[in-house]
Amino acid sequence: MSNKQRFAVILLSLLALAPPFAIPQLSAMQEAATQQEGAEDARIHQEAVNRELEAFRAAQLSLRQAMGIAEKRHAGSRTADISFDGASGSPVYRVKTVQHNRLWEHAIDAKTGDTIGAETVSHLKDLNPDDRNNVMALRTVRQELSDAVVIAEQVASGRAIGGSLMDDNGKLNFVVVVVNGGGDLKQVVLEPPQTRGRGSNARHGSR
């Protein structure tokens, strides 16, 4: 019997032997402990977000510049996903580019623009169904993720910290996360223009 199983059996035994008035008291203690753990988790999460934003503000390279560097590694490739990672020793942009049936993953130094480490490559068939469908849908639109970043930064009045693709009822959308001047994260969703030249429709909200 594992330690976890033993603990469960002991706890159930104590509850069975305890007088009726002791059970509500234990429940209250458990509820208080759960609330305390939740508050602690929220504090730790917020501290991690603050560190990430601080590292991002110090980055000399913009999101679009990192995308351009990654795309030049393979002529004709297009960015499908990009995120800022300030948790590593040196802050980097993690960029995924696609071309034909291949997907490359790059780490671009957020200060120097240098490529960190070796790129990894995978085949389209190796992706999960959602990611594969998004990449396939990217082939059907002319707008690039970098174009969506420009619009999102204007709409949310800030700097983009990440961008990705999202399927919305069969339609491809670009999702861009922007840090505004007040340090708030804004998510902007853009629908690529139709082939007849309709402009992008943007909607945004706080995260």
Model-derived features: where do they sit?
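Long, terminal "pre-/pro-" and other extracytoplasmic accessory regions
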Residues: 2-207
